[in-house]
């Protein structure tokens, strides 16, 4: 039942009628169409003529040009033999239709309203295709052909031969378009214009009869009339021309994507350049003036009989179609010649073949034909889906900035405003009548009175702002802007009336006044008055964060890669130093913060493991070790260097006590090298570096131990007095044959159970010969080296080269760097180099680029657990019963560090200078046991049957530090983690527009984190966009070397795309050194030819002056690739300057100026 009633359903709210689409003419043709024209008959409906391949039809339209009333063929098929013909161009007048064929024939048909058409004239004299036709009047026809001639036909004579032949030159230059001027006949002169494949615009005067009829047909230029005037501006073929409806102006369009406006009258006969140029987005095929004037025409301002008024150029629109399969027609007006007024698209998006304006004085319509063989009428006054208006869709506000001190002009202008450039006529009496001609910003008096613009002064100016950056220097504004602003303020201050503007005054806020409105008023009070422009408000805005000088310094000095022998931490410190040198303190702290976070991330992932702290229990609670420390004074004198130094180095080593033989199993080599570096001289460091090599340690292991005393450095005795304690320590280290130091390196590289010397010593004082000892040591040794290699490969650069250790280096005055030698860092096998890559405060801080007092982790939140275990076990917790009375220095090298590591630890009471303050601490007879951190693990014992696998060994086998693991690490949840800090730094730099900082971070950290960087911080496309913009900016600032380095150091995943983007063709353009105009020299090119020796760019056609000659030989610098410019401004040939600077080894400029080559 429901389904049967559904057919009776209807919309109770009524039907919504669809929006009616405007009616327009669309006529499809079964033949291929190439051209069209209009038959103008007064008092009758318009008639459109279509021509093409085997097609010549006449269409009669209705009054509003929306429908075809009648359709007929002009060619009578009954009388005309059936043969192929192709119509290439059409022109109509009165009742005559002239068509140019592809075989060079011109046929003229006479049409009637009754449909009786006949062939009236058949003109055959062209050798090639006819490209253009035009009627001078009803009896004179002009035709232009591909054979390079323009022929004039007199239809009254019925002669098949032309009465006159015109040619651009004596050689064949194909004619693309020609037209007779209707404005010159008033003075009894007939003018014909033509454009050619050479890009030339030729003007012919038909009154000159020299050579007319002589040698006709003998050649293109034989007996032909040459042009009266010839202009050449197009760089390629000129394809179309059209004369203005009211004045002696002509449009020319060419393949060079330019539309030129020329004045071909007597007043403009001496001009060498077009009046106006419109740049289009495609090669121009056809160009046409509109026959209907604009709705708001510009009134004439000049009344001269021989010069047309330029205002008529703005009263008419013009349209153009494009070559190369473009499906649009662009409509322009010289009021806004940079943006099309309308863009008409073909309905089927097929390329436009030809178009004409409708011959009407009321409607602005276009007839167009496309390669779809469809005739379409477009009404520009109605809204059509195929017509777009870019001016209506454009935003009303547009801004453009230049980095640094930007001189900004705020323009307030309506879309229909235009500039005529007319002289000023001010008739009002002022006290400045004698300087009225000097008013450069004045405008002509408008038809009606309008209030003048009075610029108000402000209390807050940009000049009152002081730059926050000391490197920014005050740059003056442009003199014209400054002078106009100051003089305008001076006039308004005196109460003088300014010349009235062309439009009503613009509302201005006080903040829109210029920079010089107050500060420059007094200085220019006696200057000539100038009226400000009613359209432009000029001001200067300083941008400290985008200063050119700072940009150049940062771009050139920032390290975008890790140099050989340095680490990423060192690069962060060096970049921080560069940022601080230009007062970019925020960037400086960002670099420091990233370096500290990078170090902490490494330490947490490498050492923050509870199993490492458990290795110290068996050493502190062993009774044999406790009793061994109470032997004699000589035993106590040989305590570890770390205990002797206090907490200065021991805190960094994290395992330093008097009973653990200074150093843990995971950083033993580094710890030994650190102590040697602190007390050894430069000569001794080279020997010690050899002693700690892996090869020598392995050799000593194979030879065995000579005595138990050599195994345990605590058994080494010294007989020096207390007053020579420091010297005794240094002398003990200076002995090259001291085996205790060699064995200490061995002990630290062995497992923890072997460093428990009480378990390895027997009652007779000898070391038990256990085969498992050497096996265990050899099994451990490669794993330790592997761990060091993994860390080094992760933190340092991929390539490593030897550094000259003899090179002089500067060091800072802190206690730590004063004791370090650069040779230790330069040693390729030194473990200290590994430590130098882990911490900026422990590595090469002594270099000249290091930043003193660089702090990190000031509140000790992220102190590794191994450090806390070392402090607890070494007796530095404080208290009267501490077994070591020496007070250590602070954990950090920063003198502002906190006195305590955390709330539950005792503070260290002395500074870094108190290495030995109380010798009685060495003789304490009782050692307090270390606090129980983890359950004791018995790794090896003599009583056990088989040795157990060390937990440290298991950890080192599995522990491999990699930054890619940070993506899933819990440390990323911390706001101060490296990933979070890097993300914030990159995003902030990107949002602030700081290209240097953003791109430097990308170049340094992208390959380090790879997937983390792309997934979390910036995608690869965003990174590529930033780097490409950075490269373009560097090239724009002439920093080409830096731009090349950025491309070379780009991340591996972006290097290829960035290199392809950066490798673009470079267009070199030279400007005149005198008039500063572009060296085009088209006049000389047309006169001498492009391959002539007289043509070049060592002179300027605009100012007729020669450019600077070679400073060495005095000859002109001909060519574009042989000129080498110096910084002093002189130039010369490449060979001449090579001979002067390279062969003769001269350093000064050949011109004798004070310039000296670096």
Swiss-Prot record:
Residue spans crossing the bilayer: none
Zinc finger (RING-type) residue numbers: 1110-1153
SMART domains linked to this entry: WD40
Cellular compartment(s): Vacuole
Pfam families: WD40
Positions with biased composition (Basic and acidic residues): 425-452, 610-621, 681-702, 735-746
Gene Ontology MF terms: zinc ion binding
Comp. bias (Low complexity): 505-526, 890-909
Gene Ontology biological process: positive regulation of macroautophagy; positive regulation of TORC1 signaling
Location of the region described as Disordered in the Swiss-Prot/TrEMBL record: 421-529, 610-637, 678-808, 837-909
Residue windows of the WD repeats: 80-119, 125-163, 170-214, 233-272, 293-342
Keyword hit for Disulfide bond: no
Keyword annotations from UniProtKB, A to Z: Metal-binding, Repeat, Vacuole, WD repeat, Zinc, Zinc-finger
Family listed: Belongs to the WD repeat RTC1 family.
Task performed by this protein: May be involved in a process influencing telomere capping.
Protein name: Restriction of telomere capping protein 1
Organismal lineage: Eukaryota, Fungi, Dikarya, Ascomycota, Saccharomycotina
